[in-house]
Amino acid sequence: MNLVVLNGRLTRDPELKFGQSGKAYSRFSIAVDRPFQSSSDKNSQTADFINCVAFGKTAEFIGEYFRKGRKILLNGRLQMSQYESEGKKITTYVVIADSVEFGEAKTSSGTTETSSYGRSESKSTNNTIETPGFDENSSDDMGAPTEIDDEFPF
């Protein structure tokens, strides 16, 4: 299973562009804190900078509502690409964002507030957007039979 979950801050404003087919895509980078132990300070932190891309409605949502420094929660998958440059094989990795959420809520004064877990304090349920293909109205049983037989087949 290829699943990536990130919680970080945008390092720059997202770039919202449209492909030849008219489909939106957005490129952005997230700084994600990571604790590590150094010889001088046992509880140090550093940040990993992770390149991301989103498509369709998710890209439009990011382009409209997110800016540099804004906290973002992201679910997606890791994608590897390879190409040659000056005779050298280059490998790059990017996270494809399938869904995103606000990592903090804006208050009426324009400041942001987060809980101790970095989750939004907002009671709004409309702060998540997912890529097309997921039907929120479908049942969550994934097509499983409704009756369970207690007999084992072996």
From Swiss-Prot:
This is Single-stranded DNA-binding protein. The gene is ssb. Residues 107-119 have a biased composition (Low complexity). It comes from Fusobacterium nucleatum subsp. nucleatum (strain ATCC 25586 / DSM 15643 / BCRC 10681 / CIP 101130 / JCM 8532 / KCTC 2640 / LMG 13131 / VPI 4355). PANTHER family: SINGLE-STRANDED DNA-BINDING PROTEIN (PTHR10302:SF27). HAMAP family: SSB. Homotetramer. Residues 1-104 form the SSB domain. One of its GO terms (cellular component) is nucleoid. GO terms for biological process: DNA replication. Pfam families: SSB. GO terms for molecular function: enzyme activator activity; single-stranded DNA binding. Gene3D superfamilies: Nucleic acid-binding proteins (2.40.50.140). Keywords: DNA-binding. PROSITE patterns: SSB. Residues 105-154 are annotated as: Disordered. The lineage of its organism: Bacteria, Fusobacteriati, Fusobacteriota, Fusobacteriia, Fusobacteriales. SUPFAM superfamilies: Nucleic acid-binding proteins. InterPro entries: NA-bd_OB-fold, Primosome_PriB/ssb, ssDNA-bd.
